[in-house]
Amino acid sequence: MRKPELAAAIAEKADLTKEQANRVLNALLDEITGALNRKDSVTLVGFGTFLQRHRGARTGKNPQTGQPVKIKASNTVAFKPGKALRDAVN
């Protein structure tokens, strides 16, 4: 499912116009992004938690040449699914 399809599904279930649902979805994504930029986690009880994780510097390997390559430290986004979501999928 892509973003426009998700917005359409929200519009139908919440009795909103597609434009309103799209604004709601964009606001939600903006808030999650902002919280992660501030190094906060976002927990949606039953659904899961979005959090920022730090990946330390490490040595990788160039797959074409086999030579070692230094990979800089970086931050990444992680998602830990909640119990209700895990149960719904299984």
From Swiss-Prot:
Any one Gene Ontology BP term: chromosome condensation
Gene Ontology MF annotations: DNA binding; structural constituent of chromatin
Family: Belongs to the bacterial histone-like protein family.
Keywords of the record: DNA condensation, DNA-binding
Lineage: Bacteria, Pseudomonadati, Pseudomonadota, Gammaproteobacteria, Pseudomonadales
Protein name: DNA-binding protein HU-alpha
Keyword DNA-binding set for record: yes
Gene name per UniProt: hupA
Subunit structure: Heterodimer of an alpha and a beta chain.
UniProt-listed InterPro entries: Hist_DNA-bd, Histone-like_DNA-bd_CS, IHF-like_DNA-bd_dom_sf
Keyword Translocase assigned: no
